[in-house]
Structure formats: structure tokens, C-alpha cells
Swiss-Prot record:
Induction: Induced in response to high concentrations of Zn(2+) or Pb(2+). Expression of the zraSR operon is positively autoregulated by ZraR. Expression also requires the RNA polymerase sigma-54 factor. Its main location: cytoplasm. This is Transcriptional regulatory protein ZraR. GO terms for biological process: phosphorelay signal transduction system; positive regulation of DNA-templated transcription. Pfam families: HTH_8, Response_reg, Sigma54_activat. The lineage of its organism: Bacteria, Pseudomonadati, Pseudomonadota, Gammaproteobacteria, Enterobacterales. Activity of the ZraS/ZraR two-component system is repressed by the zinc-bound form of ZraP, which probably interacts with the periplasmic region of ZraS.
Length: 441
């Protein structure tokens, strides 16, 4: 199995041991975060979704068993491997009863560590394949980050109600997908979802689109047209870029919301409508109200329930999932056998700033698939702005040769032991002769 995008948290109050493990695991291609106490580990688990936790049993303040219990309370699905000394195997048995997936005896045998990690991750992935992922893929939303999980929980809470929803987020973050998810999860899901981008139309056209018009109401009105409010009757009306509408349209929209009735352009007939309204904007409407550009009463009518859609910068851990999702789509569409991204290309995607958010990522992946002549997308197929993104030192996903990794780990152990080769070999679980042989390569 590949190790790209697998996040491991190492928990140990021995900083030197943490550093050695980090170098080793990164050399095997894993993403590694460190925690030097149980408290730090819990903070990180709250902030990030990890694929696996590697936790020492003997720690000051909060031991490994207590840390394990708290981690399982926060996320029961996360696999935890416990590290223990020979003298505390009974503690390892207790850890297994508490929910640990397996345990490792210290000093660690690197081959056994690698095999145990592979086994634990394979076990987790087989469970994931049998249970629905927290991606809301039925709504076209992909992600496992805490920010995405929070968004999905908000959607689940808001959807069953009849409350008006105001969705705020930068352009390209997927505000319409959120609106569609709310509608699809609501009691109105069998009725129409009607959408309209308010920024795409001038005032007169927007009025006609929203409320409809009679035949002959204006030049070109050769037949009567029902507006979007009437089309959405019984269902949901989604108005995108609501912050761009004119003062006159704000007045008309406010009346429609308050009275639950509309009037076609050129008609005196009042039409009652039963519509749930969802609006979206990239603007700060509270600031627009303070500046006098948006009506305060309309703002309060719209902002009954507010949902903030995170930018792609706020959910970077979802970028590999999103990139893979788009890659599969465009590879099928272009009938290309694309296997994936090179580690360098994925590094660039993860560290790029994404001012255009998900829409920009989608376009970048489509472009790369179209230009690709090989099997893996590299930096050559990415737009220049992305390909020139600086990668912070030590955060590359490139996999180092095993010989280099072993040498780094041995040097770290020697530094920890003050250059004592015998002690370094003992802590690494190898003979002094083996240590010297590996150093000389």
C-alpha cells in the first residue's frame, strides 16, 4: 500500500525517541506529527483527523492508558498502537482491553514496527470500505477534515428545520453544494430546488426572473413567465450572491419573504408561495449593512441561521481527497489511464494558497489530466502559479531511500547517547556491529 497522505501521531514524553521515530516514519513516506504529552495528543486529535496514533505507555502527568481512553472518547474509529517495555507487558494487555489495536515492545524492532503499521492501516482501510465515509459524497462534497465534519454536522442540524439559511464563504468554496445538501436532507427534498445567481443579472432581468412577468410587460416579453419563487413553491429557493442585489430589489425581496407572496411584473395579481429560502454571499453582509449598502431588516430576515463554508486553505488535509476525486472524474471523461500524482506534485497542491478554492483545484486537475502524456501527474502538468509554490523545509512527501533513513536514525540515536555506539545500538534494538556496518554504507 502507498503511504501518501497517511497521517500518524507519535505520542511520547521522550523527545529524543519522538525525533528518531519521526525521522524513520517520514522516511517510509508517512506524514508525522509529534506530541510530548497526553494533553498535547488530545489537543492534536481534536484539531486533526489522524489515520493512526502511536503512543507510549509510560508518560508523566497522563499515562498512555489514560491517553488511549480519551482518544477513543474523541474518535472511537482511530487505531492506536501502544509502545511498552518488556517489564510492562501486562500494561499492554490492559491497553488492548481498553481499545488499543496492538502493542509494540521497546526497544522497537524496525521491521516489526513497519509490518505492524501496515497491518493496522490495512485493517482500518478495510473497515472504511465497509462503512460510509464522512464525505457526503451523495451531495458532491468530499473531505474528512475537522472543518468539513463541522460543516456536515451543521447541515444535518439545519436541514430538518424551515429556517432561512445564510451561507457565507469565499468564491469557489462550494456554497451551492451546501445549499443542495440542506435541501436534499430536508422535508422538502421531493419538491423543487430552484437556483438563481443574483450577480449574473441586471436589476430588471433579476426582477423578472424572481417574480415572473406578464406578456407584454416589457420589450421582448412575448409570453407570460412564472418567476423562480413560483417555480420553487413547496420546495427551496437558493439565491446565490445575494449581497450583489440593488436597493430596489432588496425592498421587493424583503416583502416577498415577509408576506410569503409575490406579484408578477405587469400584473396586479398577488400569488401566495410556500418557499424555504437559502441565500449565499462572499461578502460580509454585516459590514455592508454598516456601510449603508444592504438593508438591515433584510439582513436579519436572511441571517436566521448562518453557515460558514471554510476555504480550501482552512482544510488542506482534504486536498489529496479532492484532487483524487477530480482526477478520477477527468481521467474517465478524457479516457486516460492516470494512476495518480507524484509526491512532488501533491506537495505543491497541498502548500499552494488556492485563492480560487475548490473551483481552482478542479480546474488545475482537469488541465493536468488533459496535458498528461504519462501515468502520473507531475509539477510539469500543473499551472505555473502552483508549480512555483515554495515547499517548507522538512514537509516534502518525497520518500527517502531506506539506507539514508537508517543512517539518519542512527545519527539521531548517537546524538542522544553522546556518541556512545554501544548504547545507541542497544536503544535501536540492533547489535553494535550492525550499527557500524550501517554507518559505513
Amino acid at each position: 500500500m502507498t503511504h501518501d497522505n497517511i497521517d500518524i501521531l507519535v505520542v511520547d514524553d521522550d523527545i529524543s525517541h519522538c525525533t528518531i521515530l519521526q525521522a524513520l516514519l517520514r522516511g517510509w513516506g508517512y506524514n508525522v506529527a509529534l506530541a510530548n504529552s497526553g494533553r498535547q495528543a488530545l489537543e492534536q486529535v481534536r484539531e486533526q483527523v489522524f489515520d493512526l496514533v502511536l503512543c507510549d505507555v509510560r508518560m508523566a502527568e497522563m499515562d498512555g492508558i489514560a491517553t488511549l481512553k480519551e482518544i477513543k472518547a474523541l474518535n472511537p474509529a482511530i487505531p492506536v498502537l501502544i509502545m511498552t517495555a518488556y517489564s510492562s507487558v501486562e500494561t499492554a494487555v490492559e491497553a488492548l482491553k481498553t481499545g488499543a489495536l496492538d502493542y509494540l515492545i521497546k526497544p522497537l524492532d524496525f521491521d516489526n514496527l513497519q509490518a505492524t503499521l501496515e497491518k493496522a492501516l490495512a485493517h482500518t482501510h478495510s473497515i472504511d470500505a465497509e462503512t460510509p465515509a464522512v464525505t457526503a459524497s451523495q451531495f458532491g462534497m468530499v473531505g474528512k477534515s475537522p472543518a468539513m465534519q463541522h460543516l456536515l454536522s451543521e447541515i444535518a442540524l439545519v436541514a430538518p428545520s424551515e429556517a432561512t439559511v445564510l451561507i457565507h464563504g469565499d468564491s469557489g468554496t462550494g456554497k451551492e453544494l451546501v445549499a443542495r445538501a440542506i435541501h436534499a436532507s430536508s422535508a422538502r427534498s421531493e419538491k423543487p430546488l430552484v437556483t438563481l445567481n443574483c450577480a449574473a443579472l441586471n436589476e430588471s432581468l433579476l426582477e423578472s426572473e424572481l417574480f415572473g412577468h406578464e406578456k407584454g410587460a416589457f420589450t421582448g416579453a412575448d409570453k407570460r413567465r412564472e418567476g423562480r419563487f413560483v417555480e420553487a413553491d413547496g420546495g427551496t429557493l437558493f439565491l446565490d450572491e445575494i449581497g450583489d442585489i440593488s436597493p430596489m430589489m432588496q425592498v421587493r425581496l424583503l416583502r416577498a419573504i415577509q408576506e410569503r407572496e409575490v406579484q408578477r411584473v405587469g400584473s396586479n395579481q398577488i400569488i401566495s408561495v410556500d418557499v424555504r429560502l437559502i441565500a449565499a454571499t462572499h461578502r460580509d453582509l454585516a459590514a455592508e449593512v454598516n456601510a449603508g449598502r444592504f438593508r438591515q431588516d433584510l439582513y436579519y430576515r436572511l441571517n436566521v441561521v448562518a453557515i460558514e463554508v471554510p476555504s480550501l486553505r482552512q482544510r488542506r488535509e482534504d486536498i489529496p481527497l479532492l484532487a483524487g476525486h477530480f482526477l478520477q472524474r477527468f481521467a474517465e471523461r478524457n479516457r486516460k489511464a492516470v494512476k495518480g500524482f507524484t509526491p512532488q506534485a501533491m506537495d505543491l497542491l497541498i502548500h499552494y494558497d488556492w485563492p480560487g478554492n475548490i473551483r481552482e483545484l478542479e480546474n488545475a486537475v482537469e488541465r493536468a489530466v488533459v496535458l498528461l502524456t504519462g501515468e502520473y501527474i507531475s509539477e510539469r502538468e500543473l499551472p505555473l502559479a502552483i508549480a512555483s509554490t515554495p515547499i517548507p523545509l522538512g514537509q516534502s512527501q518525497d520518500i527517502q531511500p531506506l539506507v539514508e533513513v537508517e543512517k539518519e536514525v542512527i545519527l539521531a540515536a548517537l546524538e542522544k547517547t553522546g556518541g556512545n555506539k554501544t548504547e545507541a545500538a542497544r536503544q535501536l534494538g540492533i547489535t553494535r556491529k550492525t550499527l557500524l556496518a550501517k554507518l559505513s554504507r
